[in-house]
Amino acid sequence: MKLIAGLGNPGKKYERTRHNVGFMVVDELSFRHQTPWKKSKFNGMVSEINVGGEKMILVKPLTFMNASGECIRPLMDYYNIQIEDVLIVYDDLDLPVGKIRLRQKGSAGGHNGMKSIIQHVKTQEFNRIRVGVSRPLKGEVIHYVLGDFPKAEQPDIIAAIQKSADAIEDFAQTPFIEVMNKYN
């Protein structure tokens, strides 16, 4: 069993923002597998998919980005999921829009959602997919990440969401190191 968490902020006003690209990826997986989202007792929305016989628990924390770890750790404990079977999907300002990067470990890189997860799971050694949203050319980062993707960037971000979902489906049956080699 694997736990796949897409990071984002709950609520309609954040739905299509750069900061919610993690939610968009797990939504894509739920859509592909036609599975509903249900509210969990651990302050998140969960959906269960089955890929080649491997159960994957998709989760969208409802804690807001900066407290994502408060949802992830209890779900890991409840389902008895080991850290090597966890994968976190989130936005990355340091990658161009539409680029994805898979890693097995690393720092939070200034991402508050990842800081929270690292704090709660007590390690930096877990799988992740970083989805590029680029940095703003001007203005504050907070306004940028909480803004929607402009029309010109939508084809690139849709492609990145699809590619990320493909990589996650591969992770159901393939060691993450091999998935990294295929998608990086």
UniProtKB/Swiss-Prot annotation:
Record's subcellular location: Cytoplasm
Give GO MF terms, alphabetically: peptidyl-tRNA hydrolase activity; tRNA binding
Q: Name one GO cellular component term.
A: cytoplasm
Q: Could you tell me the keywords of this UniProt record?
A: Cytoplasm, Hydrolase, RNA-binding, tRNA-binding
Which reactions are catalysed by this chain?
an N-acyl-L-alpha-aminoacyl-tRNA + H2O = an N-acyl-L-amino acid + a tRNA + H(+)
Pfam families in alphabetical order: Pept_tRNA_hydro
Origin superkingdom: Bacteria
Residue(s) at site: Discriminates between blocked and unblocked aminoacyl-tRNA: N9
Q: Could you tell me the Gene Ontology terms of the biological process aspect for this record?
A: protein quality control for misfolded or incompletely synthesized proteins; rescue of stalled ribosome
Q: What EC number is given for this enzyme?
A: 3.1.1.29
Q: Output the InterPro entries linked to this UniProt entry.
A: Pept_tRNA_hydro, Pept_tRNA_hydro_CS, Pept_tRNA_hydro_sf
| Active-site residues, record numbering mapped to chain | H19
Residues reported in the UniProt entry to bind tRNA: Y14, F64, N66, N112
> Which residues are marked as site: Stabilizes the basic form of H active site to accept a proton?
D91
- Function recorded in the entry: Hydrolyzes ribosome-free peptidyl-tRNAs (with 1 or more amino acids incorporated), which drop off the ribosome during protein synthesis, or as a result of ribosome stalling.
Q: Oligomeric state and partners?
A: Monomer.
NCBIfam families named among the record's database cross-references: pth
UniProt lists the family membership as follows: Belongs to the PTH family.
What protein is this chain from? Peptidyl-tRNA hydrolase
**Organism from which the protein derives:** Listeria innocua serovar 6a (strain ATCC BAA-680 / CLIP 11262)
Q: From which lineage does this chain's organism come? A: Bacteria, Bacillati, Bacillota, Bacilli, Bacillales
